[in-house]
Amino acid sequence: MTQEKMTSVSSRIVHALCCVLLLAASRHVIGSELPLDKIKLPPGFKISLYADNVPGARSMALSPDGTLFVGTRGKKVYALPNRGKRAGELITLASGLNTPNGVAFRDGALYVAEINRILRFDNVESHLRNPPRPVVVNDSFPTDTHHGWKFIRFGPDGLLYVPVGAPCNICEPDPARYAGIFRMKPDGSALEQYARGVRNSVGFDWNPDTHELWFTDNGRDWLGNNAPPDELNHAPHSGMNFGYPYCHGRAIADSDFGSAHACSEFTPPAMELGPHVAALGMRFYTGKMFPENYRNQIFIAEHGSWNRVPPIGYRITLVRLKSGKAASYEVFAEGWLQGLFAWGRPVDVQAMPDGALLVSDDKAGVIYRIGYGDV
């Protein structure tokens, strides 16, 4: 074995041991025991529990009537009627599904993304406790479970956007099937690829002023503690290529595949995020509760690293825009990570009608509410 390979193996062993210690320390804490006082926020902001028993809470979608739908990476989808600062009773809308991470709401129907298909529950709010049998909208997606869970959302063009992750850490998958963002009509027809070279996006939104797509992307593993960065990308039109698997961040050529293409051939990220932070859900904040300087800025849920020493992420960050371009990257809420102990992992963010910001947490199994002032 060469010295280079021995060093690589040793590095991975150290990473693995640290991960074991982190997981061992990260016991599940029930909602009433969560140390919310550990969460640091800018002055004037407050965090509380919106729902304290939502096992595996992941992606969120809000209906115009205020019902919050929550996907999971287990087998269930939940519904939470809005009761103001606290959610109503947790309702199990569906069970027995295949990793129903993604949820989206349109015209009275809930769309749910499994690994390889999109389902639709029609007239769902009239039948939360006894929903109709779902309609299979599209079942043509790959069955790979590696990066197979999906975030979905309807764009301003009325189309449903669906990412398909790379089925690996680093490889050259079929570019027509993997590592991209796709879109289709609400009935599942006219499926087409919108963006390429996207390793694993689990969150996107559209700028409310320009209606252009922005999305997060998770960087590859095993290039070191500080490389590559996760990414916030801007895709104002279809057909753009963001570099995976050849290039990471603005100019990091991949150690396995980078010789095939120069980084200059691809669209660079709008903002490089922290390395291995696992940037997932993101939203442009359009509410009126927060101070004006937060309006139309991007909140990002960073789920947290699994193989970095020391751990990083486990927080909500804010990317500020200036003249339509990403200008700064800062921490908004942190404290879920205490040393090597992570008691919570943010997944998605969702603004409520009153302007409060909800944050889902699949580790603690809760949904937080971040408000400003006494509201």
Task: Please name every model-derived segment.
Residues 49-54, 91-96, 137-144, 193-197, ...:
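Surface loop/turn motifs at the tips and blade-to-blade linkers of beta-strand repeat domains
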Residues 56, 89, 96-99, 106, ...:
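Beta-rich catalytic cores
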Residues 72-73, 115-117, 123, 165-167, ...:
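Short loop/turn segments immediately following the C-termini of beta-strands
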Residues 67-71, 109-112, 159-163, 212-216, ...:
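Conserved beta-propeller blade signature
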Residues 116-155, 163-166, 195:
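Asp-box/WD-like beta-propeller blade repeats and closely related beta-sheet repeat scaffolds
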Residues 30-41, 149, 166-169, 183-189, ...:
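Beta-propeller domain segments
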Residues 48-73, 278-284, 300:
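Beta-strand-rich domains and repeat architectures in extracellular enzymes and scaffolds
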